[in-house]
Amino acid sequence: MALILDGKSLSKKIREEIKKEVENFTSKGFRPPALAVILVGNDPASEIYVNNKRKACEKVGIKSLFYHLPQDVSEEKLLGLIYELNMNEEVDGILVQLPLPKHIDQTRVILSISPEKDVDGFHPENMGKLVAQIEDGFIPCTPLGIDILLKHYGIDVKGKDVTIVGAGFIVGRPLSLLMLWRNATVSVCHIHTKDVKKFTKEADILISATGVPHLIKEDMIKEGAVVVDVGISRLNGKIVGDVDFERVKEKASAITPVPGGVGPMTVTALLLNTLKSYKRKFAHLISTTNP
């Protein structure tokens, strides 16, 4: 039976530490960290994700500023709001919930967010820092959450064969860069990969981020592999991941559940990035208040 990589319990522990750190700053007269969250439209899944992020902020003492714009909002109006938030010294992070409606240029929106407030880590400046392995950038939240989860359970990716199924902008691509930074040997499978099973069978660590329910079967992994499931879907009324959990857990050495694995770690990584931005802004003042 595989070790369950419990992202929910680890997230709870990290969030308690974040809360204490925020309380330490506010007790010295500093304002709390602030995250601005922008939601365009009424996509049910996006609304759930945004609510989860806002609740997580409030529980650790991070101020959540919520901007809910209509589905038909103009791109210029959205960019105008982002400009105002960029200029607001009391905002530490800006998050625009993706995906956006088709009439809005997602790339233009991402580029409009100040890199210093891009706590999602999608701005080319932060992606470039990930490529260059520069510590002071923001790492995208799901890859960062996975990295923290693996480290917590003592799973070292150095020298290991890591296969990532899914080459998306939000998870697959930045995760491949982060795994390279951690000195793994990385393979990335995508829609044009001819034989996905060939790569997954060789993986010491298999990470799937496709959103295709139960894509990863028991016969696609090798004995003793570590399996990380990023996907979240509904199948027959139940929430499931990319991995056929019940069967794969009998063959894997460690596995993340869905829900309760990567999801909570993604939100926790967002909180960590927001705190990082806040501390950077007040670094010179914080150091002078410490004995």
Curated annotation (Swiss-Prot):
Gene Ontology terms: cellular component: cytosol
Gene Ontology MF terms: methenyltetrahydrofolate cyclohydrolase activity; methylenetetrahydrofolate dehydrogenase (NADP+) activity
InterPro entries: Aminoacid_DH-like_N_sf, NAD(P)-bd_dom_sf, THF_DH/CycHdrlase, THF_DH/CycHdrlase_cat_dom, THF_DH/CycHdrlase_CS, THF_DH/CycHdrlase_NAD-bd_dom
Pfam families on file: THF_DHG_CYH, THF_DHG_CYH_C
Annotated catalysed reactions: (6R)-5,10-methylene-5,6,7,8-tetrahydrofolate + NADP(+) = (6R)-5,10-methenyltetrahydrofolate + NADPH; (6R)-5,10-methenyltetrahydrofolate + H2O = (6R)-10-formyltetrahydrofolate + H(+)
Amino-acid positions noted as binding NADP(+) in the UniProt annotation, renumbered to this chain: G166, A167, G168, I191, I232
Keyword Nucleotide-binding annotated: no
Pathway(s) per entry: One-carbon metabolism; tetrahydrofolate interconversion
Keywords: Amino-acid biosynthesis, Histidine biosynthesis, Hydrolase, Methionine biosynthesis, Multifunctional enzyme, NADP, One-carbon metabolism, Oxidoreductase, Purine biosynthesis
Lineage top rank: taxon: Bacteria
Alphabetical list of Gene3D superfamilies matching this protein: Leucine Dehydrogenase, chain A, domain 1 (3.40.50.10860), NAD(P)-binding Rossmann-like Domain (3.40.50.720)
Keyword Disulfide bond listed: no
UniProt record, GO biological process: L-histidine biosynthetic process; methionine biosynthetic process; purine nucleotide biosynthetic process; tetrahydrofolate interconversion
Signal peptide (residue range): none
Its EC number(s): 1.5.1.5, 3.5.4.9
Family: Belongs to the tetrahydrofolate dehydrogenase/cyclohydrolase family.
Assembly: Homodimer.
Function field: Catalyzes the oxidation of 5,10-methylenetetrahydrofolate to 5,10-methenyltetrahydrofolate and then the hydrolysis of 5,10-methenyltetrahydrofolate to 10-formyltetrahydrofolate.
Name under which the protein is recorded: Bifunctional protein FolD
